[in-house]
Each structure stands twice: as C-alpha cells, then as structure tokens.
UniProtKB/Swiss-Prot annotation:
Any one Gene Ontology BP term: tyrosyl-tRNA aminoacylation
Binding site for ATP: K249
Reaction(s) this enzyme catalyzes, per UniProt: tRNA(Tyr) + L-tyrosine + ATP = L-tyrosyl-tRNA(Tyr) + AMP + diphosphate + H(+)
MF terms in GO: ATP binding; tyrosine-tRNA ligase activity
Key words, A-Z: Aminoacyl-tRNA synthetase, ATP-binding, Cytoplasm, Ligase, Nucleotide-binding, Protein biosynthesis
Alphabetical list of HAMAP family matching this protein: Tyr_tRNA_synth_type4
UniProt binding sites for L-tyrosine: Y37, Y169, Q173, D176, Q191
UniProt EC number: 6.1.1.1
GO cellular component term, pick one: cytoplasm
Gene from which the chain derives: tyrS
Family per record: Belongs to the class-I aminoacyl-tRNA synthetase family. TyrS type 4 subfamily.
Signal peptide limits: none
This protein's name: Tyrosine--tRNA ligase
Length: 372
C-alpha cells in the first residue's frame, strides 16, 4: 500500500479533520512504525457513536499500518464522577464490558481485535514516576486560560465554582498522548482542544518527548464526526454546540446502543429528528451513512417507497442519497425505514453476541447503571 492510499484511509469518513495532513504524510514517508491512541471515559452503555464511529477509524488505521491503542480512562472517569465515582466499579467495567464490546465491534467492522492494545489508565500510571514528572512538566507550560479554553462549554460556564478536578483533566489528557507515544491521537471533534494543547507543548516538554528517527515532532491529531442525538429538535448552530447535542449514554432515547434489539432500533429511529429535504446535522442520514455507505457498495441500497410515489429506489453512494433526499425524492419515513434496516444488519452480530456469550456482561452493566 502506498503512502497516498494510507492517507486516504486516515481521511476516510467519518474523519472530520486531521491536524495536519502534510505532517501525516511526512510521518508515513519516514517509514517509522506509528502509534495511535483513542481514550474513553468509562460510564454507561456503549452507543453507535462511541462504538461503531470510533472503532471504524481504528480499523482504518490498522489497515494503514498504524499500531492502534484504546485507552480506558478509569482515573479520568473517577475525576468526572462517572458510575457514581466508584473506582472499583469503573475499573471492572473497563476491563470487561468495554474491552469485549470494542473487540466485537472491531471484528464486525473487518478489523483485527487482537491487533489493538487496550490500556487501563491506572496501569499506565502505576509505579510510573516519569509519567507524573511529565504531567508536572506539562502544567509548567500551560496557562490557566489555555486549560479553561480546552474545557467543554459547560465547564467554561462554571466560572470560579468549577471543581479543580475538571482543570486537572486536560493536562492528564495531554500527558496520556506522550506517555503512550501516540503519534496520532484520535477522538471525536469535541477532543480537538485537548489535542491542540498537546501540539502546543510538544516541543517544550522534557519527559516522553514524541520523536520519529530521533527528531522531535508534534502529534498529528485525528478527529472524527460526532453523531447528533436522535432526539434533537433543531440543528446545532455550530460544531461546538453539536458536541453538547451529540448522542449520550445517559439519555437512552438520544442514542442507538450497540446491544439494542431490532425493535428498539426501529422505535428509536421512527421518533428521530429528520426534517424533510434537510441534510445538515440530520441524525438519520448520518446513521445510514455510517451503516451502509462507509465502504464502496457492491450492490445498491434499496430504499422502499410506495408505488404511487415512484416505487423503490436503488442507491449506490451516500452522495447520491443526499441529493435524492435534498430534492424531496426520498421521504423521511422511507429514509427512516432504510436506516433502521441497515443498522439492524450492521449490529446483528453484536446483538447476537449480547444475547449469547456476552449476556452476562450486559446484565452486569444493567445492574451497575441501575444502582449508580
């Protein structure tokens, strides 16, 4: 595979941006074995945004010859009071439900689950003096203003009442990039600010400097699209506002969970926000794109329509679908039906796993989320 093909894999949907593509090209040209990482807080059930969107890029990176790493951020989750702030529960969920679910999704998407390294945050930090020196070093090169700017909208609005833990979080994220030797830190577009901080301190830190062939480099940040919540009632006004309106583990009707049954998927999609002719921030269109149009189709997607409205449509590409929807030739109800069936087909192996070998994991997660 040549360098341009590898770059195309990294840029492939659902990628939203790479900072920068030219630096990525230089990394590939070096011939150096590159490391990736994506980090996750440990909280509730895994939905299609966390699972399929994120892991689809992990699979792309595997194919591009990059060593992929999934960071299970137990300490970060504890700082953010996830799962009731119970660190033991957070760790248990991380190394069981999260690892096994991600592995299954990687397999379903055509990747190799065994080729991805899963790292628990507390294991990275344990007896690791250099990590803590790195963290302190990073704080020496960041201002309070920079850290505040990297917070979520909610965090920035809290003013003087913000918990100190929230301000510790961004430097921890930055430290993780370097401690994991991640040439390509990866996350949703909502992680952009933290990755920019990592790039800003890359040439200043003394510990864990990121190098390729002895030359110090900045990490190349990869950001994928966020899926809008199913239950939004209007379009977000900006990319940042979308990060506050994305699918949420804590709001079941906002998301398709990877273990949802076919009937649950149909019911959620039927109620989803899907304005006619509107293709921007349309969660139903985005779900159909990730489930049916990530790879070049070998057969057309059939969108069933009543005969009086022209009968069934055969669609070969997402661009064709988007144009048809914008022109009003595909009705929201027909789009929702097609999306539901595509999602059911994609997630069927995952659903079957949680009905069989993974049933105990799912039951344990249900019990944990109820008691938290």
């Amino acid at each position: 595979m040549d360098i341009e093909e590898r770059i195309s894999l990294v840029l492939k949907y659902p990628t939203e941006e790479v900072i920068t593509v030219e630096e990525l090209r230089e990394l590939f040209q070096s011939g150096y074995k590159l490391n990736h990482y994506i980090g996750f807080e440990i909280s509730g059930f895994i939905h299609i945004g966390t699972g399929v969107v994120s892991m689809s890029k992990v699979v792309d990176l595997q194919k591009a010859g990059v060593k992929t790493q999934v960071f299970l951020a137990d300490i970060h989750s504890w700082l953010n009071n996830k799962l009731g702030g119970d660190l033991d529960i957070i760790r248990k969920v991380a190394v069981t439900y999260y690892v096994e679910t991600f592995k299954k999704i990687i397999e379903v998407l055509g990747g190799d689950p065994d080729a991805t390294r899963f790292i628990l945050g507390s294991e990275l930090y344990h007896h690791n003096d250099e990590y803590w020196l790195l963290l302190m070093d990073i704080t020496r090169h960041l201002t309070l203003s920079q850290v505040r700017h990297s917070l979520t909208i909610l965090g920035r609005k809290m003013g003087e009442s913000i918990p100190l833990a929230y301000l510790v979080y961004p430097p921890l994220q930055v430290a993780d990039v370097f401690a994991l030797e991640a040439h390509i830190p990866h996350g949703g577009i909502d992680q952009r600010r933290a990755h920019i901080l990592a790039r800003q301190v890359a040439d200043k830190i003394r510990f864990y400097p990121l190098k390729v062939d002895g030359k110090r480099i900045k990490p190349v940040a990869l950001h994928h699209k966020l899926l809008p919540a199913l239950n939004i009632t209007s379009k977000p006004s900006s990319r940042e506002e979308l990060s506050e309106m994305k699918m949420s583990k804590s709001i079941p009707q906002s998301a398709i969970f990877v273990h949802d049954s076919p009937d649950e998927i149909r019911q959620k999609i039927a109620k989803a926000y899907c304005p006619p002719r509107d293709t921007e921030y349309n969660p139903v269109l985005e779900l159909l794109r990730i489930s049916a149009f990530r790879e070049k189709r070998k057969t057309p997607l059939v969108i069933k329509r009543p005969a009086q409205y022209g009968g069934d449509l055969e669609v070969w590409s997402y661009e064709e679908l988007e144009a048809l929807y914008r022109d009003g030739r595909v009705h929201p109800a027909d789009l929702k039906t097609a999306t539901s069936e595509a999602l059911i087909t994609l997630l069927e192996p995952v659903y079957r796993y949680f009905q069989g070998p993974g049933a105990k994991l799912l039951e344990e997660m249900k019990n944990i989320t109820i008691t938290r």
